[in-house]
């Protein structure tokens, strides 16, 4: 017999070798990788909640300062109007003139205390009386310093924060994973079993009679 001829262009077979440790880690590490992904998702949710809370605090502070500024301006305007009204001691009747586009009201003032603004100097007696009145008012009313109001006790939460906290709570519940209790299974097993106790002779005869009839 002649020798077998080798086929032209034949190539040797390639052999693939795997690292056993890495292969074992990959095949047995599905749960581990799943827990790592879940942990990373929880950390991301916590980070988003902190950023949203910080943003809400800044917005709340800006609105609060704006409201405080508006109140201070309104108080200043009221004080100015009260001072002007206090200077007028007596008024005459006002007269209104109606025009097609607007109305004009003319009020005549007979007496005006210009010393209240500081345009005219007060007499010594009036100065002493005002100083005494100011001292009495200071004693009756304690000094109040303008300060920012305290923050509210309840946190100011947005819809985004509520949704993030709900998802975080759901993930934590999944992570906990309640195990089924074995006490219920034991109770079911015990309830299925018949309680065996002492029986009388007549009862035993009845039972044996029933068994015999069934056999027949």
Curated annotation (Swiss-Prot):
Q: Which is an annotated GO molecular function term of this record? A: rRNA binding
Q: Where is the composition biased (Polar residues)?
A: 191-200
> Where do the segments described as Disordered lie?
120-154, 167-216
Q: Where is the composition biased (Basic residues)?
A: 171-181
Keywords in alphabetical order, please.
Answer: Coiled coil, Nucleus, RNA-binding, rRNA-binding
State the InterPro entries in the record. Answer: Nucleolar_protein_12
Compartmental location:
Nucleus, Nucleolus
Protein family according to the UniProt entry: Belongs to the RRP17 family.
Name of the molecule in the record: Nucleolar protein 12
What is the species listed in this Swiss-Prot or TrEMBL entry? Xenopus tropicalis (Western clawed frog)
Provide the organism lineage as a comma list.
Eukaryota, Metazoa, Chordata, Craniata, Vertebrata
Identify the gene encoding this protein: nol12
